């Protein structure tokens, strides 16, 4: 029919027009309705016949509602295209509300019209509102929109769906009770109704979908399940509308339905939603619409009126909101309930404001789970967005459309819900950012709670735990008591834990005592046999314990010694420099080779506390260099190596190696360590290493004179003096320091060496490994002019060597008499060696980790094995240490490395 004609052409067109003419909603009812009517006619000719019966009177009452697929054949007249409420042509609407249950523009539905609406709905009365319906709806909406603006937030999403349902229902009723009519009327409605008119297309489609899935559902939710798709839906629609005044709750209940209905209704409002209705069985769309409309009516108090006014009321609520935004009947259609409802349902129009709010709920639809349909369709959402009077602006803003669009973009519509609930929300309710204040409040609360808890916990916890009878020490109890305020609960727990621990300890003690008694009994019973067995069995453990305790004590002593040497870092630096210089001098002469060992022995023996590390360095560096550069002009770095040549001697391999052999030394660092072991155990590495103590001590003295004879004699002289001092003075490091001081003066190595020396303590056992790397590096340095580098390298090498050489020195110090004419230094060395032995545990890491000289020392098999093992570890670790050599450049750069070296 004409209405169909309008619907097919105006289904989508109306939607577009509705969007474009959203601002025109007041006028939209009539102009859009013709397309809506055309669409509705196409879609709902059957509806038109059905609607005339139900909506005839309404059509008469509502000539504006004429446009609408729901208009009966008589109502197919394009008086006003289709009314969104009635979706009927003007004629259909003109037929009068009595016929179609539609209210004429000027006519308001009487309160008793609800039965008529029910009948009309059963007869598929048109739901879409004509201009008159829309105007009435707008008025009612304006009145009730403000009242229900708040209620609309939840209900008006339902209202949307209901309004949409009503609109589609009205159009469906107008078209015919046949399902096809309803579906066509839905399309007609959508065609007549501007998509932005009332509900989002998504909402409508959702409403329609849910009604389609169960047309009676919306109706049932409204309390009037749709019967036949056409009739039943109108009935449910009527019931819903009758219930609409109450249904503001229902809208919430119907929100899900509106979600389905609204998308369909957008179909009725806009061609797309209407097609949705069409795809669905008309009956289902109608029930959906009916239920939807009822939902809208329920959401809006006026909806009952709309139901009475051939479901125009339910849509009139939207109409009131939507029509002004929408131009032509399509907007009225979208607000079909509003237009028709306004007349019969002035109170429902307040509900209709809910639908108009429903527009906002369009947004709210997406805001609320119930109103999921609300914002789904951008078009209806616009219509939905307006709350009461805001509806027009909302639809104009097309906030629903924008909301859905923005939602897609991750944004949200500007509806009040979104604004309030923070899609594009204003900042959340201001919360105190005064964290200190909050913290204090929380703290005070916690303190109060703790105070209360201690009272409770004291009584409760005290009852079970009897803190008075606590097993903890008095000090612990006092601490606990004193700290109760801050940690009452914690202390209670801690007290429990402590008690448990004490109990466990007591149990363990009791068990141990019992075991001891048992063992004592056993031992007494089988003590003699057991001692042999147990001793044999326990011997390894005891030996391990003894060795471990000895090593740990030694390690501690070594650590202390290292710390002392680091503390004396400046003097140690000087010593290192002197030792290095001396090593260099010694390196210049072959004798220094032996001298460095004596140096090592002397320095390690004499400076074990400070320079235990240095003495090993001295050994490593002087020996290496003395052996390496006995006759070379590397006296400076020979002095630098002075400590290292002993290493070279200890190594024995680089006797002819030049100072450049710093690299060799480095490579031979492991050999140095092993040779240090040699020096200690096997004398073969060097003559002085044969008798490390005696030879080294003499070699120390020799080294002093030899360095003098070799290049860098002033340093040698100093070195000699320093070595003599070393031999004389228990702390050999200081003489090396004096030697170093000259070399430091001559070379920058003094300060650098201190860092190295400092680091040497750090390096400790690792220094040996580093020593190898140092050896190679410092070797070039020594070969090079910078004694500093050489000294550093040698002292560092010596450091590792020192660790190794120190045991050698200590061991060699004991046999210090052999090669050195100056027996006093030897004797001192020996005494130093003894001292070192005594101090080793506390003085030197080398003492702990470096193998001792096995030759001149009496050892148990266990100790000897331990020493062999140490040597093995040194040999293997040396290489590794070489690989893991420290970046000595940093140390040379940092004079404060001694502390870091620790």
Swiss-Prot record:
<feature type="compositionally biased region" description="Low complexity">
    <location>
        <begin position="263"/>
        <end position="283"/>
    </location>
</feature>
<feature type="coiled-coil region">
    <location>
        <begin position="490"/>
        <end position="524"/>
    </location>
</feature>
<feature type="compositionally biased region" description="Polar residues">
    <location>
        <begin position="596"/>
        <end position="609"/>
    </location>
</feature>
<feature type="region of interest" description="Disordered">
    <location>
        <begin position="210"/>
        <end position="319"/>
    </location>
</feature>
<dbReference type="GO" id="GO:0005634">
    <property type="term" value="C:nucleus"/>
</dbReference>
<feature type="compositionally biased region" description="Polar residues">
    <location>
        <begin position="306"/>
        <end position="317"/>
    </location>
</feature>
<dbReference type="GO" id="GO:0005654">
    <property type="term" value="C:nucleoplasm"/>
</dbReference>
<feature type="region of interest" description="Disordered">
    <location>
        <begin position="679"/>
        <end position="854"/>
    </location>
</feature>
<feature type="modified residue" description="Phosphoserine">
    <location>
        <position position="773"/>
    </location>
</feature>
<dbReference type="GO" id="GO:0005730">
    <property type="term" value="C:nucleolus"/>
</dbReference>
<dbReference type="GO" id="GO:0005737">
    <property type="term" value="C:cytoplasm"/>
</dbReference>
<keyword id="KW-0175">Coiled coil</keyword>
<protein>
    <recommendedName>
        <fullName>Protein FAM193B</fullName>
    </recommendedName>
</protein>
<keyword id="KW-0539">Nucleus</keyword>
<keyword id="KW-0963">Cytoplasm</keyword>
<feature type="compositionally biased region" description="Acidic residues">
    <location>
        <begin position="382"/>
        <end position="393"/>
    </location>
</feature>
<feature type="region of interest" description="Disordered">
    <location>
        <begin position="382"/>
        <end position="409"/>
    </location>
</feature>
<dbReference type="Pfam" id="PF15914">
    <property type="entry name" value="FAM193_C"/>
</dbReference>
<dbReference type="GO" id="GO:0016607">
    <property type="term" value="C:nuclear speck"/>
</dbReference>
<feature type="compositionally biased region" description="Low complexity">
    <location>
        <begin position="682"/>
        <end position="701"/>
    </location>
</feature>
<feature type="region of interest" description="Disordered">
    <location>
        <begin position="581"/>
        <end position="655"/>
    </location>
</feature>
<feature type="modified residue" description="Phosphoserine">
    <location>
        <position position="785"/>
    </location>
</feature>
<dbReference type="InterPro" id="IPR029717">
    <property type="entry name" value="FAM193"/>
</dbReference>
<comment type="similarity">
    <text>Belongs to the FAM193 family.</text>
</comment>
<feature type="region of interest" description="Disordered">
    <location>
        <begin position="1"/>
        <end position="79"/>
    </location>
</feature>
<feature type="compositionally biased region" description="Low complexity">
    <location>
        <begin position="775"/>
        <end position="786"/>
    </location>
</feature>
<feature type="compositionally biased region" description="Pro residues">
    <location>
        <begin position="26"/>
        <end position="36"/>
    </location>
</feature>
<keyword id="KW-0597">Phosphoprotein</keyword>
<feature type="compositionally biased region" description="Low complexity">
    <location>
        <begin position="170"/>
        <end position="185"/>
    </location>
</feature>
<feature type="modified residue" description="Phosphoserine">
    <location>
        <position position="892"/>
    </location>
</feature>
<feature type="compositionally biased region" description="Polar residues">
    <location>
        <begin position="618"/>
        <end position="627"/>
    </location>
</feature>
<feature type="region of interest" description="Disordered">
    <location>
        <begin position="159"/>
        <end position="192"/>
    </location>
</feature>
<dbReference type="InterPro" id="IPR031802">
    <property type="entry name" value="FAM193_C"/>
</dbReference>
